[in-house]
């Protein structure tokens, strides 16, 4: 590996997680997101270290910030899973024992035991369920309704659709988690977390993993 | 109510359940289905009693068999649910205590206690999940794969998608059922039943409900 610049503090660099819809950044402890069209406007001066699951958005980042560095090769997550997304790998790297849920445009559920990734499964993103309901029957294309609780059984179509979607996602996570701690990240983390007693929202989970990876690679100094 | 012909035996009439995709029939103890284009070819001679959730398919039936009778008005299911599909009502009418799952182009899950419908929820049909996955990310549009068990955690994208879909449906049903008996009908009933220990497949469930309704209305003689 070539000699690389080393940073004494997270403050001196910018972390970037390139997703399928948005591009997420962590600058020190500030989090912000951008569409690929707005990247230039961000005017980032510091060195960018990134991961990406979307080639097109990655190109857009490199177009604006040609020195940004992909850190996918700088770390290793122990797993037998073939094709595990780099964002899922980073989130799992930040958890030693527990269940990692990334609830974004898809919902990924991964199990980690003593730092080893044991496997995981994928559900559609909450906003994407509408397409499956619409194809099931026209009347099932219902507007999203936030639920306060799953205690009361639905008594109309709109509630029945929203309840089914949330209960199936929640009970799937709980079935896999059993009594383990649940770590949630992604846009729907906060909403889902309210239904999961043993869970914590960790907005920075992917960035926490990136920080660990940079430390292991010696790019960021361990304090 | 006008005087109606009374039948001594189920053998003397044909039951019909008009769905969104197919039109299902029960002739004595034989079950068969038809697309609306093929109805004429069936050449049914006996009197038809039907329920319908699809206006277009209903018109097609009446076009071929103008004497067919809609029995929706002939019965009552105790419920506070507004807009409960007539097929769900009929399936629930056939169960006194338990959970009724109709796994077709949508998956409906309904709870019945001492003959009263307590409420229920709706999930997309298994075949319809593909549309939600596709919208979540292109790579998640995976072909359906039948799973033998949910014991082994997925270690690739195709398994992760199929496992997530099945586990979320199964764990949702189990969460609602607790220790109650689960009655499954619809095209995917047999497949789902294999993952649900306290379940029975009842292919005729909707027709059993229709038979009860006809008996209560005095159209079919009680033996």
UniProtKB/Swiss-Prot annotation, chains A, B:
K(+) binds at residue 102. It catalyses: (R)-pantothenate + ATP = (R)-4'-phosphopantothenate + ADP + H(+). Gene3D superfamilies: 3.30.420.40. ATP binds at residues 17-24, 105. It is an enzyme of class 2 (transferase). The keyword Metal-binding applies. One of its GO terms (molecular function) is metal ion binding. Substrate binds at residues 81, 85-88, 157. Coiled coil: none annotated. Keywords: ATP-binding, Coenzyme A biosynthesis, Cytoplasm, Kinase, Metal-binding, Nucleotide-binding, Potassium, Transferase. GO terms for biological process: coenzyme A biosynthetic process. Pathway: Cofactor biosynthesis; coenzyme A biosynthesis; CoA from (R)-pantothenate: step 1/5. Catalyzes the phosphorylation of pantothenate (Pan), the first step in CoA biosynthesis. Belongs to the type III pantothenate kinase family. This is Type III pantothenate kinase. It comes from Helicobacter pylori (strain HPAG1).
């Amino acid at each position: 590996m070539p000699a690389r610049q080393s940073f004494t503090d997270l403050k001196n660099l910018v972390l970037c997680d390139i997703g399928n819809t948005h591009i997420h950044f962590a600058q020190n402890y500030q989090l912000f997101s951008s569409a690929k069209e707005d990247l230039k406007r961000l005017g980032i001066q510091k060195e960018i270290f990134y991961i990406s699951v979307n080639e097109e958005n990655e190109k857009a980042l490199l177009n604006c910030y040609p020195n940004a560095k992909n850190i996918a090769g700088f770390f290793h997550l122990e797993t037998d899973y073939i094709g595990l997304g780099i964002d899922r790998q980073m989130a799992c790297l930040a958890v030693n024992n527990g269940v990692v849920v990334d609830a974004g445009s898809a919902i990924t559920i991964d199990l980690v035991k003593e730092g080893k990734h044991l496997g995981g499964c994928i559900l559609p993103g909450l906003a994407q369920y509408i397409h499956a309901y619409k194809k099931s029957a026209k009347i099932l294309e219902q507007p999203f309704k936030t639920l306060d609780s799953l205690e009361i059984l639905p008594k109309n179509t709109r509630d029945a659709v929203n309840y089914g979607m949330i209960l199936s996602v929640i009970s799937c996570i709980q079935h896999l988690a059993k009594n383990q701690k649940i770590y949630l990240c992604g846009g729907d983390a906060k909403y889902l977390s309210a239904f999961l007693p043993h869970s914590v929202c960790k907005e920075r989970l992917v960035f926490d993993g990136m920080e660990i990876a940079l430390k292991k690679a010696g790019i960021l100094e361990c304090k």
